[in-house]
From Swiss-Prot:
Keywords: Chaperone, Mitochondrion, Transit peptide. Plays an essential role in the assembly of succinate dehydrogenase (SDH), an enzyme complex (also referred to as respiratory complex II) that is a component of both the tricarboxylic acid (TCA) cycle and the mitochondrial electron transport chain, and which couples the oxidation of succinate to fumarate with the reduction of ubiquinone (coenzyme Q) to ubiquinol. Promotes maturation of the iron-sulfur protein subunit of the SDH catalytic dimer, protecting it from the deleterious effects of oxidants. May act together with SDHAF1. One of its GO terms (cellular component) is mitochondrial intermembrane space. The lineage of its organism: Eukaryota, Amoebozoa, Evosea, Eumycetozoa, Dictyostelia. This is Succinate dehydrogenase assembly factor 3, mitochondrial. Belongs to the complex I LYR family. SDHAF3 subfamily. The gene is acn9. InterPro entries: SDHAF3/Sdh7. GO terms for biological process: mitochondrial respiratory chain complex II assembly; succinate metabolic process. The keyword Chaperone applies. Residues 73-101 are annotated as: Disordered. Residues 75-95 have a biased composition (Low complexity). It comes from Dictyostelium discoideum. CDD domains: Complex1_LYR_SDHAF3_LYRM10.
Length: 135
């Protein structure tokens, strides 16, 4: 993992943005902007920070890939049913796709004050467009 190149980071960045394509607006653009901002903020990270950054974003990407593939498989299995019963826009805000996962207790305890503030800000921003009742 110590031999990460700029191409590895670029590939991961692109994979994350590709995974975000399954999200409905405004979650997609919010997620894309968050990823872009994080990448810019970590351009001058130390090698140790860069490895941690890559590892955590790689975990996120793998979670998204697994969930995306599951959703795509489910949609392809139900494609005829969906096409026959739904003539509405595919990005209907009432049909949010639940992607991602909550942080566990260990992850929450490992966050520093700035990260907690950033997480709270992200929760606040996303709550304006998505609430648990939308699931």
């Amino acid at each position: 993992m110590n031999n990460l190149s700029k191409n590895d980071f670029l590939k991961l960045y692109r994979n994350i943005l590709r995974c975000h394509k399954i999200l409905q607006e405004p979650m997609r653009s919010m997620g894309d902007q968050y990823v872009k901002t994080e990448w810019k903020l970590h351009k001058k990270a130390t090698p140790k920070q860069a490895i941690q950054f890559y590892e955590q974003w790689n975990i996120y990407c793998n979670i998204l890939l697994t969930q995306r593939d599951s959703i795509l498989k489910e949609n392809s299995n139900n494609n005829d049913n969906y096409n026959n019963n739904n003539n509405d826009n595919n990005n209907d805000n009432n049909n949010f796709i639940n992607i991602g996962q909550d942080l566990n207790e260990k992850q929450m305890k490992s966050l520093n004050k700035k990260q907690i503030e950033q997480l709270d800000k992200l929760k606040s921003e996303t709550s304006t467009v998505y609430t648990p009742s939308d699931k």
